[in-house]
């Protein structure tokens, strides 16, 4: 860990030196057993299930500490893209923004991850950069107030995201198994029962009760 930081038992992965630190922490939440209108009913995550990324700049006084929450699907997306780009000379630029205006706040946070494998016609030792910027929105324009950036090598960023995804897989198996067993499978069993009942009735020969009898006298 970096200086002036306390151990966090929810910490999944971290990379640090004397200047900066990047860490990932478990802010995951299991699915709501009663369902969530904003998520697929069979999703293994609650609406606000997240991986919290932390960036700290120790060189400033006081140190700058910024965080950004990523959806598990965003973590997996980045993991896949990083794996495909490593050992190539391709550039990469991905970002996501959170606007808190709907909460009556003009705060804006921006997470960005870039790759620039060549600098000044030479292979970069640390081609990746992960940054978090925090600021405000004024008249539709973003005004940055704080920023922390961490440079990483191909190996460092791969190990970082591999550790996160490995943890994510175990977490989903741990919480997903009882959810599937206690919620999804009973629902499917009831659905099968209903389908079988309809099929059984459709296969039965008609009886006199199925016909209307008219008296023409």
Where are these regions (language model features)?
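N-terminal "first-domain core" detector
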Residues: 1-63
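Beta-strand-rich binding-surface signature
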Residues: 50, 67, 127-129
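Compact, well-ordered interaction domains used in eukaryotic information-processing assemblies
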Residues: 37-44, 54-100
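Short, solvent-exposed interaction modules
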Residues: 80-84, 88, 97-151
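Intrinsically disordered, low-complexity regions
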Residues: 9-12, 89-97, 107-111, 208-213
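N-terminal, helix-rich and Lys/Arg-enriched segments in bacterial and organellar proteins
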Residues: 19-32, 62, 72-79, 109-116, ...
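Short, low-complexity cationic-aromatic patches
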Residues: 42-47, 68-72, 119-123, 149-158
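Mixed-charge, glycine-accented linear interaction segment located at domain edges/termini
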Residues: 133-217
